[in-house]
Amino acid sequence: MKIVAIARDKCFSPHSVENDYAILQAVVEGLQQPIVWVAEEQVRIAGLPPADLYLTMARSAAVLQQLAEAEKAGKRVVNAAESVAQCVRSVLHRVLQAHAIPLPPTEGNAGYWLKRGDASAQEQGDVVFCRDKEALAMQQQLFVQRGVTDWVVEAHLPGDLLKFYGVAGGFFQYFYPSDDGISKFGDEQRNGLAHHYAFDATQLQTMVEQVAALTGVEVYGGDVIVAPSGEFFLIDFNDWPSFSRCRETAAKAIVAWVKHNYLNETK
């Protein structure tokens, strides 16, 4: 079986280039198969190398289109092109609303988050905290000046910020960013140090796996806010994150999933 691994373009890996590369490398090494490496930009320019299975972290529309065509031709892709497209924020937001996934409200008294809706965050200005409605309107004008007219607005929710990581087949882990200080843009500081409010972790995993099923994503991660009451609200969901907090165990889970479902191996 011919396998190609597609490394994510730098523009889709803000402050995470090395970590994104590291998780894909760990999976490639774990599979112990001859695998061709290719950069997302190279695929965009020169096209997909021939393969039976693509392990891809690509997010650009041009590459996703090529992967979708490969799938139509019977090739296998992890994560599938359509599933990655479903993770575009505004698309995902509509899907989650339609299926009653707990999301932050659009109104609140603790500020707002303005989030670019037509793509995943590529720079700090794509997700902006606004202290009130006036600041929100100003930031929306700045978005328009940048050519961004598709966005999502969510009320800021006080509570514990929690990051989760998952792989189809049952792997699920979560962490509190304030416990280890790891941050991409520093936005986590808005929620301060975690209080470690009690919540139902099994219920959280069930909800996250429902989101994964709705999108079709097999390798995923995201963020929730856990309120003092124990309720949680999904604020982000991404295809194939860096798994920087649990890379080794996550890579093993991805390898096991790929072997069992795509290489017809169970060892």
Where are the regions a protein language model picked out?
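A short beta-strand motif that forms the metal-chelation/ATP-contact edge
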Residues: 51-55, 115, 164-166, 230-245
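A short linear hydrophobic-aromatic micro-motif
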Residues: 103, 113, 149-153, 219-222
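Phosphate-binding site of ATP-dependent enzymes
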Residues: 130-215
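Conserved N-proximal alpha/beta basic substrate-recognition cap immediately N-terminal to
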Residues: 6-105, 120
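A long amphipathic alpha-helix within ATP-dependent nucleotide-binding catalytic cores
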Residues: 184-234, 246, 252-266
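Extreme N-terminal starter segment of soluble prokaryotic enzymes
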Residues: 1-5
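Protein kinase-like catalytic core scaffold
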Residues: 112, 172, 220, 233-236
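Conserved anion/nucleotide-ligand pocket segment
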Residues: 112-142
